[in-house]
Curated annotation (Swiss-Prot):
One of its GO terms (biological process) is regulation of RNA splicing. This is Dual specificity protein kinase CLK2. SMART domains: S_TKc. The modification Phosphoserine is found at S34, S98, S142. The lineage of its organism: Eukaryota, Metazoa, Chordata, Craniata, Vertebrata. The active site is at D290.
Amino acid sequence: MPHPRRYHSSERGSRGSYREHYRSRKHKRRRSRSWSSSSDRTRRRRREDSYHVRSRSSYDDRSSDRRVYDRRYCGSYRRNDYSRDRGDAYYDTDYRHSYEYQRENSSYRSQRSSRRKHRRRRRRSRTFSRSSSQHSSRRAKSVEDDAEGHLIYHVGDWLQERYEIVSTLGEGTFGRVVQCVDHRRGGARVALKIIKNVEKYKEAARLEINVLEKINEKDPDNKNLCVQMFDWFDYHGHMCISFELLGLSTFDFLKDNNYLPYPIHQVRHMAFQLCQAVKFLHDNKLTHTDLKPENILFVNSDYELTYNLEKKRDERSVKSTAVRVVDFGSATFDHEHHSTIVSTRHYRAPEVILELGWSQPCDVWSIGCIIFEYYVGFTLFQTHDNREHLAMMERILGPIPSRMIRKTRKQKYFYRGRLDWDENTSAGRYVRENCKPLRRYLTSEAEEHHQLFDLIESMLEYEPAKRLTLGEALQHPFFARLRAEPPNKLWDSSRDISR
C-alpha cells in the first residue's frame, strides 16, 4: 500500500529543485522510509487480521468449509459466527473503510488521545451516589477503558459500593462477565455482565434489560427456567447487569468432555426444560432468536469422573442436568421490528435463510438442532454458506417444499423450481460424504431413541406452519416419564431426576 505521507508538504515548497532537495536528504529519507514501511506492514497485517475476524464473507467462502466434521474444529469454527453472520446488525457496512482511513490520517492518533482524555475528565466529574464514601471517590477517579471499550478492572475492585469483583468468568464481543460478591445480598455470589462502553452494545444491553424486566414481572418466582436478573446499573458508561451465578454452558461442558454426547436420559431432561422455558417466552409473545448450546447453562456443572476402558480415557458425567436459558440480547416481541437475519448459522431456520419472515417457529427449529447436538456430540449443519446449508437440509431432511421456493426472493439459490446444487463439485462431495438422512444418525434401535428422532423430525419441519409447537412438544411420548414427576421435584436443581 503506498505511503501517503512519504514527502512532507514543507519540502515541496522549499528553495531549489525538488530533485536536489531529495538528494540532499537521501540517506535520512531511506532510513525513515524503511522504518515506516516496516511499521506500516505490521499495522496493516494487524488491521487485515482484525478485519477477517469481523468479516462475514472471508469465513463463509473459505476452503476450510470443505473439512470433514472434526469435533475440535467445530468448536473453534463456530466461536464468533453470530456476529459475522448478522452482518449489518453488528458491524456497519462501511466500518472497515472508515477504520483504514482513520489509521492513515496523520492527525488521527492525537485526536483520539484528546478525545480519551476529555472522556476521562468527564467521567471523573460524575457522581453516582449522594452518599459516596471517600473510598468510592478515589475508585471513580481511576476508572478507565481499554482500546476496545472494555472496563479495566482488577480483582478486589468494588462497583456501586456493592459488588466486589472476584474473578473473570468469560468474554464476548459485548463485554465481559465477572463473578462478584453482592454485599447487599448477604455476600451471595452473582454473575455481573459488564458491557463495553460502545453505543451499539449499550443499546443492545438496554433492550436485553427491557426483556429481562418483563420476564421478572411475568415470572417473579423464576419457575420458568430463564436466567434471573437481580439488578442493573450504568457504571461510567458501562451498562452492568447482575444475574444469578450459573455453571458451564451445555456446549462448554460438551467441549471439555471431548465432545462425548450426553446420555439419552440427560438429553431428555435438558430438552424438556428447554421446551418449557421457551414455551414461556412464546406464551408471552417473545421470540428468543438465538438459541444454541452456548446459551443454555447448567445451574451447577459439577461432574463425576469415570474411566472408559474401551476408549482409555476419563469421561465426565454432570451430576445435575438442571439448566437455564440465557442471553436475551436478541429477543424480539411480536409487535417489534423483526430483523431479516437472526440466529447463529448452525441453528438458523430455512424461512430465515430464504427471507420468508419468521416468528416463534424459528426457535423450535433451533431447539431441534440443539437436541440433535446433545445426542451425537456435533452440529447437524456444519457450514457457513447459505446454498450449502440448504443442500445439507435436503440431504438430511428431504427436498425443500416447492411452495417455499416459489415464495422466496432468494431465487439465485434455485433453478427451475429446484435447489441449484452440483453434487460433483468439492462442495457437493463434502455434503454427500458428511451428511446423511436423519434417522441414520440413530445410535440405538431402542424405542426411546426412535421417539427422540420423531420429536426432532417434527421440530425440523421445513414449513413453519407445520412445525411442532412447544406445547405439543411437551406432550410428546419422549417426555412421558418426566410429565409424571411432581413439579417441585422436576425443577429441583440439587437433584438429577433424569436417570
